[in-house]
Amino acid sequence: MKKFLSILSTVVVLLLASCMGGTSKSGTGGAGGEVTGVSGSSMQEPSPYGMVLVKRGSLKMGTESTDSLWGKDLPTREISVDAFWMDEHEVTNSMYRQFVFWVRDSIIRERLADPAYGGDESYKIEEDKNGDPITPHLNWNKSIPWKNPDEDQQRAIESVYTIHPFTGERMLDASQMNYRYETFDYATAALRKYRLNPAERNLNTDVQVDPNEEVMISKDTAYVDDEGIIHRETLTRPLSSMWDFVNTYIINVYPDTTCWINDFQNAENEVYMRLYFSHANYNDFPVVGVNWEQANAFCNWRTNYLIRGLGASAKFIQRYRLPTEAEWEYAARGKEGNELPWTQEGVKSDKGCFYANFKPDRGNYTEDGSLITSKVGIFSANSNGLYDMAGNVAEWTSTIFTEAGVLSMSDMNPELYYNAAKEDPYALKKKSVRGGSWKDPESFIKSAWRSSEYQNVGRSFIGFRCVRSQVGTGAKAAKGAKSSGGKTRRQRH
């Protein structure tokens, strides 16, 4: 009898399962018991403002020629990169000033909510709509009273400005323009040796797992002391939770405007130091004096700024970041893979017009029409739709600089990222810089040319642009490849 009931219950379960199988495309069922997959939800990724899509492809990275200075063979390798969005031109003074002003306004809002400046609680949100406590954050929907502020509000606003002791000029206090942000280190968290579950750290079943093994991990943290000085520390401690993969940074984001003096001593460049970043006449010129750390901070801010603007629809939007060295060269070479971003030979047309802003001859900076930087986008774009990939300003990449270059990386989406700790030797803080600049000769503006700079140094000839990975798009199927169900199936060769 029990056996009969068991068989009967099994039949009932199978019947119910077959009834539930259906033809649902969004649930767990499949047509006729076949596994058809779960469609899930998708969204059409909007084209990012001011960016162009660089489609996936391959190239021979590097150059076959020899280093003309040292006579060394330069590293080359066949590599492939996935599709990504890239700024059509370098980040401009106007764009970067928006970042600096956002930092300024965030400081003012913090102080408007501070009891020492009147304590207007409406500038900081600490409860949700139901009155439950939440992580405090600034209220950006409430305007700063720039016009007709009361006494406390005026003190809060003026607190971010300073007066030049000689000229009496009211200036933004650059030393206060600190941006704090956090990042989650997905790459480190994915490594087996850092798994929180000890059993997942080694898949070799012949190896005895020690459940009490102590795994040490390093993470970056930062704070500002009472004197306003930023202190960065790299902590090494036992791995205990996912929070150990969160790094905290505080970066002073104001560009080093003194780079115009320090880069070119015994030159009359004071006007650039005082006005290049702040004057409206330079709005559309590439921002300079921004170091690698500041460029990364800009990318983080730009990501969060977009997410706040898009709201819930930003769930699958990829973060803004600096391009890898491989992405930069691939994008610069254009669809033809040229040595220079343009298709023609040489650096100027038959009419004598230059294709880029660089140093055409010894002591001659102006033959191409500019003495220093030029407005972005005044020269023709390459076949990828990108401007100024040669000359104007050299550009930061995310990649650490090594002599081996691409030879020390994977041949798929190659990257060599190293987050140097404060205690690391200074030599480990070099990052790869690409593209050449307004001060460089022709040989230095070629797409494969590599140079370097320390990550905490801003130069008058180095800027940057951002990229964003494209959310997965498949390759086009080969013509005539059909499955029995009539759906196109990709052929592999």
Predicted stretch roles:
Residues K3-T10:
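Sec-dependent signal peptide recognition
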Residues T23-A31, L53-V54, K60, S65, ...:
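Functional-site microenvironments in short loops/helix caps that host divalent-cation chemistry
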